[in-house]
Structure formats: structure tokens, C-alpha cells
């Protein structure tokens, strides 16, 4: 399996270190020598991120970066031992539920560093799709339910969701690009919830589908222009926020009319499942489960 890599902005967010500081540390003290992508971007590995975290910890404790850089050989030895130990103790790793409970407790306490640490542990222990299916997606559902019930605040919900989003984006950067079929993915025009869309993009990438991800709040007219230019094999839409049948039908009709006739259109999310009859009437497929992934991938 290819080693996961991150662009510098993602590595900075994962490590809690400013991009400018990473560049300065590299230039002045040679703390890292990241590989370069064919496009010339720095590509940081999980080990690089771990080194940055250790350097941040030392400097936060008052150690000068010049002195911390001298400790890199010992830091690297410790990281190698940690990786080896992790491989030898995979059977003893926490269950997905334990990870989720740890992150929920950290969210309740506004402990974002703890959320970050557990997320890193999850992604180091599990393959990307397994991590999403067993930990990240259920975690987001739990967080959403607790926000709706009033046991989590908006600030707490944002605290964890932005961390999960950063990890999903990093997994997408590292995922295979896909070669045969091409899908364009977008949220409904007023839809701000994009985690499900990111998860769909990740799975389709791993199924060999080339994905163009347009993200949140995509106007129907703009989606139509993009699709005309890209000529994909299908369009995937996501809609989570609750809406009336009339509003849902009006929005989906505008989206359908903006797209070429005959182009397969799929829609997923809680709102879509609530209005399946509308989708059927407009000849739009409602995503239901595992078999539909194979249909989208053409397998």
C-alpha cells in the first residue's frame, strides 16, 4: 500500500504548526526534507507529521528549535520504535467504538488536541475506507445527533467536524486518481453539509473512479456548466438538511434541468431518502447501499 502523504497546509494542520514555521525550520535547521510531487509540491508523510508534533512539543516546553533539531536522531529512533510496536500490537488496538467514545469525550471537554491525536491513531491503524466506515462516519452521526438533542453546542460540533474534514481531505489527496469512469460530485445549492460527499468521493476513488469534487452549495447553473465542460459518466448529489417535499422537488427539478438529458444522476443523504418518490418521478437514482457503489464504478 502506498504511503499516505499530505500537502504542507494539511501537514501543518495535523501537526498544529504554522506553514511559515515549517518552512523556516526546514530552511534554517534541516529538520525535514520532504519529497516533492511531480508538480513540485512538498509531500509530507505520517512520520514527517509525527516529527513536527515532537518538535512543537519541545518548543512549547521552552526548548529552542536549534536545540530541538539536534535531538532529531533520538526522535526518529523513538518514532521507528513506535511504528514497530504498533505493528506488533495491532490485535490489541482499541475497537472503533472506543475511539469514537474517546473523541466524543474530548469534544465535550473542548480538547481539540486529544481529538486530533485519536484521529491520527485511527488513520495509522486502519485503511482509509475502514477508518471512514467504522469510525469517522459514525462519529459524525453521533456528533450530529448530540447537537440536535442539545448535548453538544455548535462550537463543539465545529471543533470535531473541522478536524474530521481535514483528515478526509488528506485521505482524498492520497487516494488513487482513477482512470476509467468519471463522476462529478456536488452538494445541493443550499447544502452546507459535505462530509458524506467527501466520504463518497473517497470510496469512488478507491474503486477506480475519477472524481471531480465541487463541494458545498453548488448552484444548478454552475453545476450544469461544469458538467457540459467535463462530460462525466454520472453526477452524484448530496442533500442532508431537512426540507419540505415541495422545496426538495423544486431544487431537484432545477438541478435535473441544468444537466444533459440522459446523463445518470444519483442523489444521496437523509433528505433524498425522505423524498424517494420525488426522485423516482424525476428519473433520479437514490443511493441505497453497497450494490450502488458497484453500479457507479461500472463493476
Curated annotation (Swiss-Prot):
SUPFAM superfamilies: Cobalamin (vitamin B12)-binding domain, Putative DNA-binding domain. Keywords: Carotenoid biosynthesis, DNA-binding, Repressor, Transcription, Transcription regulation. InterPro entries: Cbl-bd_cap, Cobalamin-bd, Cobalamin-bd_sf, DNA-bd_dom_put_sf, MerR-type_HTH_dom, MerR_fam, Meth_synthase_dom. Residues 8-27 bind DNA. PROSITE patterns: B12_BINDING, B12_BINDING_NTER, HTH_MERR_2. Changing residue 42 to A: Lack of activity, even in the presence of cobalamin. Retains the ability to interact with CarS. Residues 180-299 form the B12-binding domain. One of its GO terms (molecular function) is metal ion binding. GO terms for biological process: carotenoid biosynthetic process. Residues 5-74 form the HTH merR-type domain. Requires cobalamin (vitamin B12) for repressor activity. In the dark, binding of cobalamin to CarH induces its oligomerization, which enhances binding to the DNA and repressor activity. Light causes cobalamin photolysis and disruption of the cobalamin-CarH complex, which decreases interaction with DNA and allows transcription of the carB operon. Interaction with CarS also prevents binding to DNA. Negative regulator of the carB operon in the dark. Binds specifically to the CarA operator, in the region around the carB promoter, which blocks access to the RNA polymerase. Belongs to the CarA/CarH B12-binding photoregulator family. Forms oligomers. Interacts with CarS. The N-terminal region interacts with DNA and CarS, and the C-terminal region is involved in oligomerization and binding of cobalamin. This is HTH-type transcriptional repressor CarH. It comes from Myxococcus xanthus. The lineage of its organism: Bacteria, Pseudomonadati, Myxococcota, Myxococcia, Myxococcales.
